[in-house]
UniProtKB/Swiss-Prot annotation:
Species annotation: Paraburkholderia xenovorans (strain LB400)
Cellular localisation: Cytoplasm
Residue ranges annotated for the PPIase FKBP-type domain, each copy included: 172-257
Lineage: Bacteria, Pseudomonadati, Pseudomonadota, Betaproteobacteria, Burkholderiales
Cellular compartments per GO CC: cytoplasm
Protein name, entry field: Trigger factor
Top-level division of the source organism's lineage: Bacteria
């Protein structure tokens, strides 16, 4: 008898599964006999419990297991016979109008959609490019110097000159202060501290607080009002105005290291050669620029593919991906040390839009890869592993690490497939190049 597949919508389908009751009962009896060989009950030796008692105790549970197994197998057989590409898990519901002597269930499910790929030649891509200039190397060196800054206390040589006993605090100085803040005459939680240190100009403190500290000399005090923003993280003071008193305890002036052989050695240049140091910095910046520009163009390619493709997205796959994203979010919270992160009440609904995009993109990419034979080749995977390993001290060990784990290798394979897709689309689409500075590139990718 042919199976009737009902069409309930664009992707939703339903089939009826019938199971002869005598066949189900036969399997139930067989499993209970097997169970009776090992079952334990008070007053009986193992395996000596009367079959009737085992049946009374376990028949309901065993029947449910048998029905689940048989319904699942029957659904699999029907799916294969009807060439159904089932998306996600089906739901089964018992029917009340089953033929006498049968169990009957409705299996409701979704199928994978037909993906209509658009003409890649109509896609428009803006490809970001960047060239590492000497000025960019200088800017990076300046950042590296600031990361290695040393602060000199009063009475030591510093940027402000030797001694500098009456020098006032200014931007870049590390200051140590005592402060007390009050709202309506009462000190609030977190509103006071002794020997509190921060660097002026880093933005760690609210602007009014930094402004009050700027210009003070050691031993001087100042009173000022500070209006907390409405969105301030401390809800008990958000939107309120506090009266602060601040006293300068210590001023330390920043001293940046000179760019010399010792500085180069601190960056891993063993012989301290400054030319080698600049070349190494340039190589690192070029690698980073390549990574960032590839990420930008990949996102543009994916957006373009979604724009030119037509398909319906199975809700079952969206819901599955939502659950994955919730699990990932909880794992992230756990890694950050958040208590009870595994049970955090994260609603799946907040990930629906993201999950729909991910599922849709996955279906489009699968169709594009299949249609244009863009699968990853072993030599491509090895080339990417080798390239990744170059940035490590022992590249051979990194290569072994990748090839010793199938999951890591599968992740690299997925990366290569994406790269193949990007290359394919760029070879067909309307591409315009846009030159940006490395600083602009870093800012753009940080905001993405």
């Amino acid at each position: 008898m042919a199976n009737v597949v009902e069409n309930l919508g664009k992707l939703e389908r339903r089939v009826t599964i019938s199971l002869p009751k005598d066949a189900v009962q036969k399997e139930v009896d067989s499993r209970i006999r097997q169970l009776a060989k090992n079952v334990r009950m008070p007053g009986f030796r193992p395996g000596k419990v009367p079959l009737k008692m085992v049946t009374q105790q376990y028949s309901g549970q065993v029947e449910a297991e048998v029905l689940s197994d048989k319904v699942g197998k029957e659904f699999f057989d029907i799916s294969r016979a009807e060439n159904l590409r089932v998306a996600g898990q089906p739901s089964f519901a018992p029917k009340t109008d089953a033929t006498e002597g049968d169990y009957a269930f409705d299996a409701t499910f979704e199928v994978y959609p037909e993906v209509k790929l658009g003409d890649v030649a109509t896609a428009e891509i803006e490809r970001t490019t960047t060239t590492i200039s000497e000025a960019e190397i200088d800017r990076t060196l300046d950042i590296l110097r600031k990361q290695r800054v040393h602060f000199h206390a009063r009475g030591e040589a510093g940027e402000h000159g030797d001694g500098g006993g009456d020098t006032a605090a200014k931007e870049g100085d590390r200051v140590t202060v005592d402060f007390v803040g009050k709202i309506e005459g009462e000190v609030f939680q977190g509103g006071s501290a002794d020997d509190f240190a921060f660097v002026l100009g880093e933005g760690r403190m609210l602007p009014e607080f930094e402004k009050a500290a700027t210009g003070l000399k050691v031993g001087e005090s100042k009173e000022f009002d500070l209006a907390f923003p409405e969105d301030y993280h401390g809800k008990e003071v958000a939107g309120k105005t506090a009266q602060f008193t601040i006293t300068m305890k210590k001023i330390e002036w920043p001293h940046l290291p000179e760019i010399d052989a010792e500085f180069a050695k601190s960056l891993g240049i063993e012989d301290g050669d400054l030319t080698k140091m600049r070349a190494e910095i340039k190589d690192n910046l070029e690698r980073e620029a390549k990574r960032r520009t590839q990420a930008i163009v990949k996102n543009q390619v994916m957006d373009a593919l979604l724009k030119i493709s037509e398909l319906d997205v199975p809700n079952a796959l969206i819901e599955q991906d939502q659950e994955r994203l919730v699990a990932m979010a909880r794992q992230d919270l756990e890694q950050r040390g958040v208590p009870n992160a595994k049970d955090a009440p994260i609603p799946a609904a907040m990930f629906k839009e993201q999950a729909e995009r991910r599922v849709k993109l996955g279906l489009v990419l699968a169709e594009l890869v299949k249609a244009n034979e863009l699968q990853a080749k072993p030599e491509q995977i090895r080339a990417e592993v080798d390239e990744f390993a170059k940035s490590y001290e022992d590249p051979k060990e990194v290569v072994r690490w990748y090839y010793s784990n199938q999951q890591r290798l599968a992740e690299m394979e997925a990366y290569v497939v994406e790269a193949n897709v990007v290359e394919f689309v760029l070879s067909k689409a309307k591409v315009t190049d846009k030159e940006v500075s490395f600083e602009e590139l870093a800012s753009a990718t940080a905001q993405a």
